[in-house]
């Protein structure tokens, strides 16, 4: 909501009933947010990604897809870590949001359950940290274009 209030356009990518319901609740709270239609072809989704200033993504497929079209990614890492070698192609390590805890990585491919039952890797990442990372990326890219 903070980014929406600052006037940033927010596009939500996802597919599936559960994700769609979450995205619907997010756009209800954020006037500048909209859902990228899942009816777009793969090529159309890549073309749309190529227009973004930044992609915010978990260490997942969208991180890698945005990387392929040269879009900087604010990547959020939980049970995995960029040190495992899965950072997006040509992405800056500074854009990765990772807690660097002693228990990381607990998995090289992600996990839905925390072996230590605390999920500190995710619960310790504040929304403010993510927002600051996004704004830093946008500012840096605007300066590069100028």
Which residue ranges define each predicted feature?
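Nucleotide-sugar donor-binding patch of glycosyltransferase catalytic domains
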Residues: 29, 35, 67-145
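N-terminal low-hydrophobic presequence detector
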Residues: 5, 145-146
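Donor-binding and catalytic core of enzymes assembling or modifying cell-surface/extracellular glycoconjugates
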Residues: 1-79
